[in-house]
Amino acid sequence: MGFKGAWNKRNRLIENPEEYYRLYKKLQRAYKLVREAIKRYGSFELLKGKTSLRDLEELLEERKQVLENLKKQLREAHKGKPKIEAEGDEQLKELIREVNRVQSEVRALEIITNRVRKYEEIYAQYKQMTEKKAYVDPKLWMRIRKMNEAGERKVVRTYSRATTIIPEFVGHTIAVHNGKTFIPVYITQDMVGHKLGEFAPTRTFKGHPDKTAKVVKKK
């Protein structure tokens, strides 16, 4: 089972692993902020299932327009009315409540839209850095790199089956998750260029049934 030449086909590594790792962490933080904003401010009635930047921007503009119209109505309703009369007007009170509600929606949408925009900007940088490159899990890469510098050889666990094995991994034992448990995989030179998941099968072959097994005859 020889893998000679496999690495030549995939020899497109990211030039700066440290910058890649920093950008990866930044992307994770931005994603977390988006999720928090949607959970805190984004009710289903408000977002209407829209989470893409373009949809959110359109929704924000729409709500801003509604707010402007309501404010205009409020100004018209206040015209020529004494303060005491205005305070007792139930229709006016309802209009004020509606203005406050839409104003809160606009603020919430602005927060969500700004965070989604920031996330998409970071994701664009991340995509540009990783496009047409061999995928290596950034956390695993940095951990192996630190172990190489310290001369350590501990077993490292990972869920990243899609990670491409790179020369820095040679000599390490990486426990790869197969969906049920971690399978220890000792990395050799021949494995370079392949995926970690190739060496931690998700299914095991238990053999064919014995020839002596009962065969049900067709009637």
UniProtKB/Swiss-Prot annotation:
Residues 1-128 are annotated as: Unknown. One of its GO terms (molecular function) is rRNA binding. It comes from the Bacteria. Residues 129-219 are annotated as: Small ribosomal subunit protein uS19. Keywords: Ribonucleoprotein, Ribosomal protein, RNA-binding, rRNA-binding. This is Small ribosomal subunit protein uS19. One of its GO terms (cellular component) is small ribosomal subunit. Belongs to the universal ribosomal protein uS19 family. The keyword Ribosomal protein applies. InterPro entries: Ribosomal_uS19 (IPR002222), Ribosomal_uS19_bac-type (IPR005732), Ribosomal_uS19_CS (IPR020934), Ribosomal_uS19_SF (IPR023575). Disulfide bonds: none annotated. Pfam families: Ribosomal_S19 (PF00203). One of its GO terms (biological process) is ribosomal small subunit assembly. Protein S19 forms a complex with S13 that binds strongly to the 16S ribosomal RNA.
